[in-house]
Amino acid sequence: MTFGEKLKIARKKQFLSQEAMAKEMGVSFSTLNRWENGKAEPNYTAQKAFHDFCVKHKIKFDDKE
């Protein structure tokens, strides 16, 4: 499973728009949109922000995904 796919699943589990998720992660809407659509890859800081978001909201992904 790609980062973008995980991002989209986590966002939808929290019933957030891309704009709201971007704000919570501290990035722009266009950046989050590019990640979800596989047009860009996040840097370490962004990956950490996503990890922290998942921990905060108790969202887990199987390592095999």
Each model region followed by its residue ranges:
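Short amphipathic helical patch at the helix-1/turn junction of helix-turn-helix
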Residues: M1, R11-K13, V27
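Short basic helix-loop element that most often maps to the first helix and adjoining turn
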Residues: E5-A20
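Residues in the recognition helix of alpha-helical DNA-binding motifs
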Residues: A10, E24, W35
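Short polybasic/polar patches that bind polyanions
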Residues: K12, K23, V55
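Short glycine/serine/threonine/alanine-rich loop segments
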Residues: L16, V27, I59
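Recognition helix of helix-turn-helix/homeodomain-like DNA-binding domains
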Residues: V27-P42
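DNA major-groove recognition helix of helix-turn-helix/homeodomain DNA-binding modules
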Residues: Y44-D63
